[in-house]
Amino acid sequence: MIKDLENEIYKSRKNLNNILVLFDYIDLSNHSIDEVNDAAAALCRVYCYLSRNGLLKRPKEDDSSANAQVKNWVCDNYINYTEKLTEIFSMANVEALQVSFLTMTMRLCKAESQMDENGTFRNQFYIRFCLELLSSSQLSDICIKDFVTSYLVPYDDVRFFFYKNSKKVISSLIESSKTDDPMANLDIVAFNTIRILSAIPSPLPSSSTSSWADEPSPSSTETSSIKRAFQESWLSALSLPLSVNLYKQVLNVIHKRVIPFLQKPNLLMDFLTDAYNSHHAVSLLALNGLFTLMISHNLDYPLFYPKLYALLDRNLLYLKTRSRFFRLLDLFLSSTHLPATLIASFIKRLARLALTAPPGAIAIVIPFIYNCLQRHPTCMQMLHRSSAESGDSFDFDQPDPLLTGAIESSLWELSTLQNHYYSNIASLASIMSQKFTKPRYELEDFLDHGYATMCDAELRRPLKNEPPIEFEKRTLASGLEKSWI
């Protein structure tokens, strides 16, 4: 039935009213998903056919001919059809339809571009699609994945205009929210925009990318235009209210997928410093981006090391993200130009925290301190000083790492760890009592240790001697006549 209605349209313009019949099929309340999909696909093919025949171009306003009336009728119904297409992205439990309708949407965008004299990408329908996509609370993960992998990554013009459109959509919705418009759900827009932006590896064209339209748009291939659109899109997204999870998602990619492609990376300074001063887990993730701005883009942030020092608390050594933190901390303290008093405070605080840390965390702290002492020999005096000489001058509660008095204190904590209940930790800590001739530890070898890996290592360890047992083993062959049981 649907196929017959479609074929009749190709045969004669007299059958254009079949468009209305097909349109009625796109109704999930009265038809099955398969019928809705088939009817929508048929109309997509019909409108692509009509665009090639010039029926999707509006006639001049003063043209009242029969042909002009047909064109206006076709264009009006085309708008209704595209609205029906985009509505599906706001419906629940229709993941398969969302992917299918995405394909139809992009085909129509291509057909519209072919109507243009230059053959470049036309944005009229695409921007309405972007508005619906970013505003949807029912957008499926599989639809986003298909949009990113099938269109945004391989096609420069689709990606470029998405950057432009997302900025326009966000600006429009922010203005709407000022008038208490209930439709302007900024949380949803932030969630969808960042999900999509974070999934794009690079905004710049590569040898494997091309244009979705027949001819590439000049602006979509110019590096300066791309970076400007990319920057405006990201800054608009970051101006929206972000949940802790969204903060984490952004901060996980910002140093690799955002900062290198911005025209003015310093514009992220406020965002990163706010993140660094916020929730503990967010602060840890903000380290990399903030440090990148400091090293590569001359950001002046004098409170970086005091704030970094404040992150060293008892909770840190129990977090899942401690491995990432120690990778970054090793990078931040690697410069030999840092003051010895600063390095000494970090060493001493970590040593103190190790006293109450789990074995997996201690296995990171000891090699980390060893490497720091080798890199900063001035701090070796802490290792050789006896705590009985003048007591421990270290002020654990002092927030400024330059004023803790750690450089005048003793690392008695490392001596204590040499008597740890877990023999492997005690053996590892004993390296501090030996000459510092051993090369620096590869920190990566210690970052993933935990109770599970330690138990597994113990269970796999071969026994040198059979352990003695209290009771004599008995077998059925030994008989029961002498048994006391």
UniProtKB/Swiss-Prot annotation:
Annotated protein name in UniProt: Uncharacterized protein C1604.06c
GO cellular component: membrane; Noc4p-Nop14p complex; nucleolus; small-subunit processome
Coiled-coil region(s): none
Residue ranges crossing the lipid bilayer per the database entry: 284-304, 328-348, 353-373
Membrane disposition: Multi-pass membrane protein
Biological process, per Gene Ontology: rRNA processing
Subcellular location: Membrane
Domain of life: Eukaryota
Record carries keyword Repeat: no
Family: Belongs to the CBF/MAK21 family.
Keyword annotations of the record: Membrane, Transmembrane, Transmembrane helix
Main localization, broad class: membrane
Entry keyword annotation includes GTP-binding: no
